[in-house]
Amino acid sequence: MDLTLTRSGTVKDPINLVSDGHITVHQLHVLADHVIIQGFTVVGGGELLLAGTGIVAQKNTVHDTQRGGIICASCTDSIIESNTVTHAATTGISISGQRITVRENLVSETVAGGDGDADGVRFFGNGLRIISNSIQDISVKGSPAALHPDCFQTFDTGHSATFDVDIIGNACRNVAENCLIATGDESGNSEAPAGVRSITFIGNDCVTDGDQAVNLRRWPNVDVRKNHLLGPNLKRAVLITNGSTHSTVRDNITRSDVAAVKIDDSSRPGFNSPF
């Protein structure tokens, strides 16, 4: 069964789309404003797709989908909270828009999808809060060699500016490549307001299998502090390249035999670090 809702509620009287926990659907699409979605199981087909203002998706289970897990596309003032996403294609949770909170979700076993990649959370837009989520067990199996399963990923190719993003207090375990990767290969995220922090990455617990835990390429104004950045294959905890200027790297914990940060000359302007 496919379920689609296009009728909106209001701020004072939202629509409650609530399951008792025993309703299973092939895909669930909510293209409306001021809707609460709770307790559904989405399995085997499309995604839980959200688009609108004032949407809350909580305590849903999404697994073995073909087009992603939970996708909040063009959302505003919305919350994705306490959901479980397992074995989704391409990305467990993807958000795009303004003032979206992703909190206390469990994402695991994302597999390579249409673009060949497999990620925990992808994020695009501004005013985003990604807090206290657990992402785990995303392997390189099935992904083309050039691609990289990551916990948190953003990029500017085909997207408007991403800034004012807080990624705080998350756990990232047994993921094949990066804990955080931000790449500005199209424009260097140049549409972001000058001098505004793009990403604040604080207090996260990362145990990944890549060469670095944090990878910034042509992506300025990132604050990386007070994280555990660990993994068996680390060559450096943080890699900053290609004009990723005005970044901060401080007070992170990593292995004693691993460089805390590797930064190229083009990224050194405005760099704030004790190293």
Regions found by a protein language model. Give the residues of each.
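Beta-solenoid repeat scaffold
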Residues: 2-38
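Extracellular beta-strand/beta-solenoid scaffold signature
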Residues: 2-4, 24-27, 44-49, 64-72, ...
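Parallel beta-helix/beta-solenoid
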Residues: 29-66, 77-86, 103, 168
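Short "repeat-start/strand-capping" segments in structured domains, especially the N-termini
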Residues: 33, 53-55, 75-77, 98-101, ...
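Oxyanion-binding "anion nests"
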Residues: 166, 171-172, 178
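Acidic, glycine- and Ser/Thr-rich low-complexity intrinsically disordered tracts
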Residues: 225, 235-275
